[in-house]
Swiss-Prot record:
Belongs to the TRAFAC class OBG-HflX-like GTPase superfamily. HflX GTPase family. It comes from Acidobacterium capsulatum (strain ATCC 51196 / DSM 11244 / BCRC 80197 / JCM 7670 / NBRC 15755 / NCIMB 13165 / 161). Keywords: Cytoplasm, GTP-binding, Magnesium, Metal-binding, Nucleotide-binding. This is GTPase HflX. GO terms for cellular component: cytoplasm. Residues 210-375 form the Hflx-type G domain. The gene is hflX. GTPase that associates with the 50S ribosomal subunit and may have a role during protein synthesis or ribosome biogenesis.
Length: 432
């Protein structure tokens, strides 16, 4: 539960009512650690939405109540706590069915939103590009469409804030047909954006510069690592989903190979299917990458659970079999004994600190090693000055060590991937 915020961009805050178990979960023997981990993660989600938590109501039950998720007795408890804490919004840690949402809105004094809507709200806060904003609005409308009953009445009572970003009050009060038309329009606009993205990717692929994608659970430190390796200055925040729109920057490895480093949106437990679908184009950077850096917060007690969740999402994206380097970040928060234990783990994990720079040189060498299927080679080329595209391709994918001009020819001494040199073998000259 939350009180009103001092933050200027937030008009109302939240009541956190947690029904954080799936039907039958208690009967399956869910551990106390797993439950507490879920509670802590949910608190962080609420805070990442810009909210102040005023109170919590927790519940562990064997089966979800079909009408209200938490049962009539618990509904009364939540209502009493919401009223006493003057909460504006009640946030559930589970997803609610349309029936449950309608019944809870009728029974409780504040606006009711569920886990997926909370995550969508956070995404709406961080979308900056046109594609990102279109994706968020599409995901919100598709999720809201079957849940329209009663929403207009609740929306009219709030001036904005958590659960109200993206599609506005008027939008959500329109009939199903109008929202369906808007969904159709958004899909068309996104398709246009995706065609442009596809064309840009095809131009990139014309010059064989490999892509290395950062993946990982939200708040594992991907953006901090991206900044440390590229100096790009991308927003790095302790809040969840600070990075929404993908970022691409070129870096040079110790072998002088150039690669593109991609920073992508973080994953999370029970990532809403509407988000995976809407953000599929963004996640194509993961699908197209030659190597994945699976960034993990090694100081987290739930690292193994988060690792498994990321593996699951990668498999859903069709990227589960891609070469991966496990990057154990935030090693500076561990004792020397704990650090040594990490290095002896399976799969040759790389223990680093993106914040201090510890282990980053070793990580770059490891990326080099992972890309050795296309080794860097030295070559001498004799290229007509009219072949500017050839010279540009060499500069983009490799390193020109020496350049000399003779008439209309350019003599180049280069270091580049073997595949790139192979494309221009007709310009090769014998070593002097």
């Amino acid at each position: 539960m939350a009180r009103r915020a001092a933050s200027a961009d937030l008009d109302s805050l939240d009541l956190d009512s947690l029904g954080d178990q799936e039907p039958g979960a208690a009967e399956k023997g869910g551990s106390d650690d797993a439950f507490e981990s879920g509670v802590a993660e949910f608190r962080e989600l609420v805070l990442s939405a810009g909210a102040e938590i005023a109170a919590e109501v927790q519940q562990r039950r064997g089966r979800a109540d079909a009408a209200t998720l938490i049962g009539s007795g618990k509904v009364e408890e939540v209502r009493a706590v919401a009223e006493s804490s003057h909460a504006d919004v009640i946030v559930f840690g589970q997803n609610l069915t349309p029936t449950q949402l309608r019944n809870l809105e009728n029974a409780l004094p504040g606006r009711v939103i569920d886990r997926t809507q909370l995550i969508l709200d956070i995404f709406a806060r961080h979308a900056r590009t046109r594609e990102g904003m279109l994706q968020v609005e599409l995901a919100q409308l598709e999720y809201m469409l079957p849940r329209l009953t009663g929403r207009g009445r609740e929306m009219s009572r709030l001036g904005g804030g958590i659960g109200t970003r993206g599609p506005g009050e008027t939008q959500l009060e329109t009939d199903r047909r109008r929202i369906q038309r808007r969904i159709s329009t958004l899909k068309g606009e996104l398709e246009s954006v995706r065609r442009i993205r596809s064309q840009q990717r095809q131009r990139r692929e014309a010059v064989p510069v490999p892509t290395v994608a950062l993946v990982g659970y939200t708040n594992a430190g991907k953006s901090t690592l991206f900044n440390a390796l590229t100096g790009a200055g991308v927003l790095a925040s302790s809040r969840m989903f600070a990075t929404l729109d993908p970022k691409l920057r070129a870096i040079v490895l110790p072998s002088r190979r150039k690669v593109l480093l991609s920073d992508t949106v973080g994953f999370i437990r029970d990532l809403p299917p509407t988000l995976i679908s809407s953000f599929r184009a963004t996640l194509e950077e993961v699908q197209k990458a030659e190597v994945l850096l699976h960034v993990q917060d090694c100081s987290s007690a739930t690292r193994e659970e988060h690792r498994a969740e990321v593996k699951h999402v990668l498999a859903e994206l069709g990227a589960g079999d891609k070469p991966q380097i496990e990057v154990l970040n935030k090693v500076d928060l561990l004792s020397p004994e704990e650090q040594e234990g990490l290095r002896s783990g399976h799969g040759r994990p790389m223990a680093i600190s993106a914040r201090t720079g510890m282990g980053l040189e070793d990580l770059l060498e490891r990326i080099d090693e992972a890309l050795q299927a296309d080794p860097m080679v030295e070559a001498r080329l004799r290229v007509p000055q009219s072949e500017g595209e050839v010279i540009a391709a060499i500069e983009a994918g490799g390193v020109i060590r020496n350049r000399e001009f003779e008439g209309n020819l350019v003599f180049l001494k280069v270091s580049a991937p073997a595949s790139l040199i192979g494309r221009f073998r007709r310009f090769a000259t014998l070593p002097k």
